[in-house]
A protein has these predicted regions:
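Rossmann-like adenosine-cofactor binding region
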Residues: 116-206, 211
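Glycine/serine-rich phosphate-binding loop and adjoining beta1-alpha1 elements at the start
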Residues: 14-81
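Single conserved hydrophobic/aromatic residue that forms the stacking wall/gate
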Residues: 1-16, 20
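Flexible, glycine/charged-enriched surface loops at secondary-structure junctions
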Residues: 14-17, 40, 77-84, 257-269, ...
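Glycine-rich beta-alpha junction loops
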Residues: 21-22, 113-118, 212-215, 273-275
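Adenosine-phosphate binding glycine-rich loop
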Residues: 72, 177-285
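Glycine-rich phosphate/diphosphate-binding loop of Rossmann-like nucleotide-binding domains
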Residues: 53-59, 63-154
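General beta-strand structural signal in soluble alpha/beta enzymes
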Residues: 14-17, 38-44, 87, 110-113, ...
Length: 285
């Protein structure tokens, strides 16, 4: 007997926004699917608010990154207040993460985007830089800081390095030049496996992407739930639920890391596999 896979519906699956797939594209996606299948706003997330999007979704990945950085500092007995932070990638994720970390008292000493970067050892004025970037679509021409390239920014001495752009930027050819204590993976796969092994041996703590940037997909889930309920939560409710989820996930991964004496990446994988294995066992599969 041939078993046909079920047709994709908003009760079974939901697409989320990512790099180059912003609100307008998600709105088109929802509209096209809806013309064929009827009103199904939950089929995609990251939509405009007017079309069933969630409050807090735009900032979610950056907010989650800042929460994870804060929890990591606590775990490693580091002081986030005054900590020197470098952010490669000052788009949606990096700019929000930088703003939240700035509000937490951290010193953002260098940032970059596709056009290059800026560095100021005394700390950049992040709110003004965000305003400049939104107005000019570039961080070039900002009144503060010295120009620095995307490659050079990875080598800046700092406490926390946050790669928030594209994958594979830290690899075996440049990993020995890094001068940070902790790497917070806000992008997807910014550290290659060979580089990851080297960092672990050198004692540089890497917080994996599947934990760090989970804030975005978490609030996408919240958006999907709101669509199914046909009820919108307040931004404070969304942010509080996100905080709770991120902190709980970090603690679970941290406990696994400590108990197994392994890297945080391996601990995150172990937690995920344990959950799947337990669900299969309970179902008798």
């Amino acid at each position: 007997m041939i078993r046909r896979p079920p047709r994709s519906t908003q009760s079974r699956s939901s697409a989320a926004s990512d790099v180059y797939k912003r609100q307008q594209i998600m709105a088109w996606f929802m509209d096209e699917y809806g013309m064929i299948n009827g009103h199904t706003p939950g089929i995609v997330t990251g939509k405009p608010l007017e079309l069933g999007g969630s409050l807090g979704r735009n900032a979610a990945t950056g907010r989650g990154t800042a929460i994870i950085a804060r929890e990591t500092a606590d775990l490693l007995n580091m002081d986030l207040n005054g900590a020197r932070i470098v952010i490669q990638g000052f788009g949606n994720v990096g700019s929000f993460a930088g703003n939240f970390l700035n509000e937490m008292g951290s010193k953002i000493i260098a940032v970059s985007n596709v056009n290059g970067g800026l560095i100021d050892p005394d700390g950049l004025d992040i709110p003004s830089l965000i305003e400049h970037n939104e107005k000019n679509k570039t961080i070039k021409g900002f009144s503060q800081g010295k120009a620095i390239s995307n490659d050079e920014i990875l080598n800046v001495e700092c406490d926390f390095l946050i790669p928030a752009a594209l994958g594979g930027v830290i690899h075996k050819m440049n990993v020995d030049k890094l001068n940070c204590k902790v790497i917070i993976e806000a992008a997807n796969g910014p550290v290659t496996p060979p580089a990851d092994d080297i960092l672990f041996k050198k004692g540089i703590h890497v917080v994996p992407d599947i934990l760090t940037n989970a804030g975005g997909v978490t609030v996408s889930y919240f958006e999907w739930v709101q669509n199914l309920q046909q009820f919108q939560w307040t931004e404070d409710e969304v942010n509080a639920k996100l905080e709770s989820k991120m902190v709980a996930a970090f603690k679970e991964v941290g406990n696994m890391m400590t108990s197994k004496d392994t890297s945080m990446r391996m601990a995150a994988f172990a937690v995920a596999i344990d959950r799947v294995a337990n669900s299969f066992e309970l179902r008798g599969v």
